[in-house]
């Protein structure tokens, strides 16, 4: 409906100069097939149609490839769905509120944007870990749907080229985590099943790093690999 409203507004503006009048507002049709059936007319032929990917599919893509534009869009959709404005402020407020509803101590979370690019964002490793815990074992089973989007070490998404050396190969195929990459900040938050079959959640964050320094990402990957190999039973 938002797209239809925008189209109608632009049509009114363009038509004014040509002496055309376009009625204000947009009405939702019951559907061409239903309308045709009610009037006894032949059903129209569909010339073309486009269907959006589902929200779940978009969330999977966002997590897999770390799509910042999609993250911002999801944030605004969440804002509208919770009665807030579809603005940046509405989106960040919605994310913080939903994190709190999931059991995360969200009172100290500071968000300047949703995708995580802004340097003013402040989220602790504990808050990321609690978010993953809510997704994996929390009472709201709806959150489980996003777990498939977590990249898998050495196999998919932003982790597809990692976990290939001797120090991290033990985590390949086992570590599932969302990456975070800025010039001086790196993060890896996710979950892994260890050698004893226990589900472990984790979040590693490196701040004040030398941009592009060798070993930064490998350090996070080695830490997650150690968790994958844990076992004392």
Language model regions located:
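A small/polar active-site loop signature that marks catalytic segments
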Residues: 1-144
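C-terminal soluble interaction/assembly domains
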Residues: 94, 104-233
């Amino acid at each position: 409906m938002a797209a239809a409203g925008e189209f109608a507004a632009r049509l009114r503006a363009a038509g004014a100069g040509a002496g055309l009048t376009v009625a204000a507002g947009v009405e939702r049709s019951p559907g061409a097939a239903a309308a045709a059936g009610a009037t006894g007319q032949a059903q129209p032929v569909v010339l073309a149609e486009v269907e959006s990917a589902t929200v779940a599919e978009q969330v999977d893509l966002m997590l897999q490839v770390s799509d910042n534009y999609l993250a911002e869009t999801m944030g605004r959709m969440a804002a509208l769905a919770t009665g807030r404005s579809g603005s940046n402020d509405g989106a960040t407020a919605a994310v913080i509120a939903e994190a709190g509803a999931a059991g995360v101590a969200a009172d100290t979370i500071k968000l300047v944007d949703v995708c995580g690019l802004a340097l003013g964002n402040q989220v602790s490793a504990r808050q990321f870990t609690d978010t993953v815990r809510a997704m994996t074992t929390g009472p709201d089973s709806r959150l489980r749907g996003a777990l498939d989007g977590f990249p898998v070490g050495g196999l998919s998404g932003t982790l597809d080229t990692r976990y290939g050396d001797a120090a991290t190969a033990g985590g390949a195929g086992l570590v599932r985590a969302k990456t975070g990459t800025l010039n001086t900040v790196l993060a890896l938050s996710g979950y892994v099943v260890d050698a004893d079959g226990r589900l472990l959640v984790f979040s590693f964050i490196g701040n004040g790093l030398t941009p592009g320094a060798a070993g930064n990402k490998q350090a996070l990957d080695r830490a997650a690999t150690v968790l994958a190999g844990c076992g004392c039973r």
